[in-house]
Amino acid sequence: MTGATLTVRVIRNFEYRTLKNVVFHDIDLATTTVDQFKKIIDERIQTDPSLKIYRTTHFDTLKIYVKAQQHKTQNLAINLDHDDWILNDGAKTLSLCGIENETELSYFELAAYKAYQANPVQKWL
């Protein structure tokens, strides 16, 4: 499918749930690779004024949060289940990774995710 719409949760901090949802339109799932999509996200972070506070964070990992028409998790920032949904192969196209139109993804720093996964405490409450 061409022209997919994807929502990406750009996560700066897990504990304080500092995140911003960013919508990307017209993404060609059949030809866009994971690494290319990360570059598209990084470019948006660097140019969109609403994402200014995210520019100093090192983002390196994409993970599927939820596929279209499926149940969301209780954690509104990240899906702590399904570590197999982390998109490790940057050369794979998005469609080969199981991404469909209206899939929601999380974009974050892997080291911060692993630390939060080991101790999932929310400090913003």
From Swiss-Prot:
Q: Which GO terms describe its cellular component?
A: cytosol; nucleus
- A single GO BP: 'de novo' protein folding
The record's section on InterPro entries has: UPF0538
Please name one Pfam family that this protein belongs to.
DUF2340
Q: Which family is this sequence assigned to?
A: Belongs to the UPF0538 family.
Entries under PANTHER family matching the protein: UPF0538 FAMILY MEMBER, UPF0538 PROTEIN C2ORF76
User: What is the name of this protein?
Assistant: UPF0538 protein C2C4.04c
Q: Give the organism, scientific name.
A: Schizosaccharomyces pombe (strain 972 / ATCC 24843)
Instruction: List the top taxonomic levels of the source.
Output: Eukaryota, Fungi, Dikarya, Ascomycota, Taphrinomycotina
